[in-house]
Curated annotation (Swiss-Prot):
Gene3D superfamilies: Jelly Rolls (2.60.120.10). The keyword Ribonucleoprotein does not apply. The keyword Transcription regulation does not apply. GO terms for molecular function: nutrient reservoir activity. Residues 129-138 have a biased composition (Acidic residues). Residues 161-308 form the Cupin type-1 domain. InterPro entries: 11S_seedstore_CS, 11S_seedstore_pln, Cupin_1, RmlC-like_jellyroll, RmlC_Cupin_sf, Seed_Storage-Functional. Residues 99-112 have a biased composition (Basic and acidic residues). It comes from Vicia faba. This is Legumin type B. SUPFAM superfamilies: RmlC-like cupins. PANTHER family: GLYCININ G5, OS03G0336100 PROTEIN-RELATED. This protein found in the seeds of many leguminous and non-leguminous plants is the source of sulfur-containing amino acids in seed meals. Keywords: Disulfide bond, Seed storage protein, Storage protein.
């Protein structure tokens, strides 16, 4: 669930061995290893699952055009998670030119997982002391999360909270909508239930940009309005791309990338129930912003101007209202 990249800055070839522990407590899926690539056009890494993946891919392309729901199937497919979204949608989400969005989908990239960097990477690294201080602060926060045995007894725990109040919003965009979250930090009883919740309100055409749950499965329930939900798996296939309305449920597996957009006629309001009392979310936009410019340029084959556009113009938070220039592309 945590995005990372590796660069060999030495003079010799590097052989790295990765151990994937699918039985760890954070994994809420099955024991099948899955690798989610944000960029490139990677090959299948686990041959034992390739036959199953090909079968799903054939089933997807055998559907009638009218049942596919979105536009991404009309474009050439890649194997990264962003290839499951259409270029038009990515251009709207990241507020970029359509050419940049097409490169993000990496449909014709023949480099697979490994990219050769000409001239080396120029990266600003944080000082070691800063990293140590951050680790100490995280350890302190973890130690303070234990129950104190006094105010956090079962009998005295608060059991109700209204996360739909506008003033309660954790994230807000006056043109796109708002997001409110309830977890064991704001409602401690959720620790015993191992659940958390998220309330999302999207205005007309508002977008909750592509994101994924690092440590939880989620259940999306529409309470008002209508819109579209897109879900992409580890092979870059859109496993769900359809309109949703009041009363409908959608299950989003852990680490699957999902994006929601409200309709043109009315907004979209929904609740998301998550199977972890402190569910963590990663947003593709924030990942791009935190990734060094040279890494993005080499990974996606972007020019410097496009990297700047992607890191700055398209990263104003996970709630987005499509710009007129993106809509006209």
């Amino acid at each position: 669930g945590i995005p990372y990249w590796t660069y060999n800055n030495g003079d010799e070839p590097l052989v790295a061995i990765s151990l994937l522990d699918t039985s760890n407590i954070a994994n809420q899926l099955d024991s099948t290893p899955r690798v989610f690539y944000l960029g490139g056009n990677p090959e299948v890494e686990f041959p034992e699952t390739q036959e199953e993946q090909q079968e799903r891919h054939q089933q997807k392309h055998s559907l009638p055009v009218g049942r596919r729901g979105g536009q991404h199937q009309q474009e050439e497919d890649g194997n990264s998670v962003l290839s499951g979204f259409s270029s038009e949608f990515l251009a709207q989400t990241f507020n970029t030119e359509e050419d940049t969005a097409k490169r993000l989908r990496s449909p014709r990239d023949k480099r697979n997982q490994i990219v050769r960097v000409e001239g080396g990477l120029r990266i600003i690294n944080p000082e070691g002391q800063q990293e140590e201080e951050e680790e100490e602060e995280e350890e302190k926060q973890r130690s303070e999360q234990g129950r104190n045995g006094l105010e956090e007894t079962i009998c005295s725990l608060k059991i109700r909270e209204n996360i739909a109040q506008p003033a309660r919003a954790d994230l807000y965009n006056p043109r796109a909508g708002s997001i409110s979250t309830a977890n064991s930090l704001t409602l401690p009883i959720l620790r015993y239930l191992r659940l958390s919740a998220e309330y999302v309100r999207l205005y007309r055409n508002g977008i909750y940009a592509p994101h994924w749950n690092i440590n939880a499965n989620s259940l999306l329930y529409v309470i008002r309005g209508e819109g579209r939900v897109r879900i992409v798996n580890s092979q870059g296939n859109a496993v769900f791309d359809n309109k949703v309305r009041k009363g409908q449920l959608v299950v989003v597996p852990q680490n699957f990338v999902v994006a929601e957009q409200a309709g043109e006629e009315e907004g979209l309001e929904y609740l998301v129930f998550k199977t972890n009392d402190r569910a963590a979310v990663s947003h593709v936009q924030q990942v791009f912003r935190a990734t060094p410019a040279d890494v993005l340029a080499n990974a996606f084959g972007l020019r410097q101007r496009q990297v700047t556009e992607l890191k700055l113009s398209g990263n104003r938070g996970p709630l987005v209202h499509p710009q007129s220039q993106s809509q006209s592309n």
